[in-house]
Amino acid sequence: MSSSSKDSSFQVETPVQNILETSTNSELQDQVSSPYEPDYNSPVKQAAASISALQTQDDTLFNNVDERTLENKDGNKSDDANFDQVSGIPSGSLEIPILNSATSNIRLTPSDTYNNIPVSDTNNEEISKNIYGAPILESTSSDFQSKDSLSTTQPSVSGGNGSTSQSPPSLDVEQNKPFSISNEPVEQETENSSTKDLQVYDFQTASEHLPEQSLQNTTYYDPSKTYSSVNFEEIEYGKSHEKLDLPYRTTDFIPYSKDLSTSPEAHRTSIYSYSANLPNYYNEHNELHEHHNPQTPSSPESAYSPENLQLNHEAQNVEYLGNNAAEKSLQMNLEDEQRFQQFLKDEESIMSNWYPGQFPSASRLFLGHLNTKSLSKRNLWKVFKIYGPLAQIVLKANYGFVQFFTNEDCARALNAEQGNFVRGQKLHLEISKIQKKYQNQIENMKKGSHVTKSNQYSEMIGNLPYPTSSRKRTRSPLMSKGKSYDRKGSISMSKNFSPDCEILVTEDCPKEFVWGVEKVFQERRLNIHTTCLYRDSNLQVIIKSCIINSVKSIILINAGLAHLGKVSVQVFKDGSSDSEVRCDEYAAVDVMVAASIVHHAKTSLMHSAASSTPSYNGERIVPDVPSPCISTNPNLPALVGSLDSVNLHHLLGFIQNTYSTTSYIPTRVSFNPNDTGGSFGTITSQSQFVVNEMPKNYARDNYEALHSQESRQRSSVAGNKQLQKILEQLAELKQPDF
């Protein structure tokens, strides 16, 4: 079919009118009045679809259809258009744009006209009305593209050379129904007439969204390309997963499916982000931990979600620093580590010599509700060491103890640390109560009742009674007349006073035991002086001061030895040179044995040779030569004279061997008087006095021998002269006659 001239343009209404005329009025009425059950194969509907497609091209609703010229496949305008003789649809490629059926109405631009009235002067609400009351599609003028710019994936109606064109494809998977197009009967077009009340709508409530519908703004047409140029910067995120290459599939815009067997897919917003929900902790360098993602800060809701509970727990297993400023001080430097190791040594020594009532009653701090798996003794030492010296730290399953030396230090730590956090644990502090089994002993000691203690120490010392006046003494027995004691360790003595024995007592030693030791030494007629050792005392300086002041021996008593009823003894003797002092020590011996050792050292010096080298302060110290055996039998010369030469020879050899045998092997310690530090071992108020320690059972095994020697030394000088005569006679008979 062709037109006669170029001026008489092609009129689309001619085939449509022919089709309408061939239809009966009842058939047309049935099709128009039944919008929900249309006849999709009706030529009327197909022709109306073609008219709608032609009128919506180039974003314009045409006023005069007969002035519209069509483009063929080659892009040339022609007055003649080829129509399919059956359907009446023009041949050639014709693509129908797919509109969004989920939105509202068609919107016209101000350049469009509606019923010969500019759209700008027309109320859009009038245009959006539908005579059938069905939902109307919404789109902008930019949604209607030219046929070259339409996507090749859209359904098309093609025809040519007499072939039947394909009907519009189905967009509803279930019903397989195309879009329904309704229109009133088309009247004869005039120059000023236009299509009237043309409405396009979709009866389906759900349909797929195509990727082009995710664009908010106009897609740009590029004639050099066969696809639409998409501005990805203006894409609304989340509208279509087909446009965005997401690593997962979302169900935001998946069509509703009635298939109950289909498993639900994960929603994008429900997928858990672990990197965004990690706790935001900082290390000691104020840097983020490695597991934290700074681009996705954690939210308070996700940080405490049940799904993330285990993750948060694992993240907190690293070294916890927390937000509390006090917890950052748990980091220990080299000096702190050295002091902590010294504390462990002192703690072991204190606990080995512990006895009830050693510390004040309110000096022990109780720590409750502790998780000892994440808390160490080092952490508690770092926290509580600033309040005073610590004696002991104990950690049990769910609680612990911190032992101070004074009540004041303990109270200060309680007030300062109550409720604070250590490695994420809140401190619940209380003053520890004394156990009932120790209360009676401590109360008796506080009241001044020495009945129990005196009986106990009397058995240890040797059943020696305490002086009755000891209970009435008001002055401490630890300080005596004759010299003054400085807390730093120096001892100043008068020139006329040089004690035989210096007793060094720690401040935690029971006074009852000290009084008993003093009594034993006084009964042996030994000059003694008692000095108290404080925690800040320098023992090496004290020992050096004793040696310079010609003190012959030192007795050490601490709490541990007092609990066992023992003392430690050191005896000083001159060495081979002036810079050398020989020191014999007897560790942990009985009090009676210690008194005998000191007395023996004193008498040895008294009977030493007068030609010995002067030692200190111009005083001569004679060598330690055992005193000879003294016999009181006046008939000894006659008995010796009656012996033959052989027996006399054996007797003389026996006497010489007896005199040359010593009761112990002395040890020598190099000592320089100008050395302020000294060369002797050091002790504290809790440690034992150890300098070249001798066997502990040595003094006990030789106590009887020492006692017998002391008895023989009390003989008169006349016996010594008689012995000298006997020795002279034996010397003459040394060579036997054969």
UniProtKB/Swiss-Prot annotation:
The lineage of its organism: Eukaryota, Fungi, Dikarya, Ascomycota, Taphrinomycotina. Pfam families: RRM_1. Residues 363-434 form the RRM domain. This is Uncharacterized RNA-binding protein C3H8.09c. Keywords: RNA-binding. Residues 1-34, 140-169, 177-197 have a biased composition (Polar residues). Residues 1-51, 140-197, 466-487 are annotated as: Disordered. PROSITE patterns: RRM. GO terms for molecular function: poly(A) binding. SUPFAM superfamilies: RNA-binding domain, RBD. GO terms for cellular component: Mei2 nuclear dot complex; nucleus.
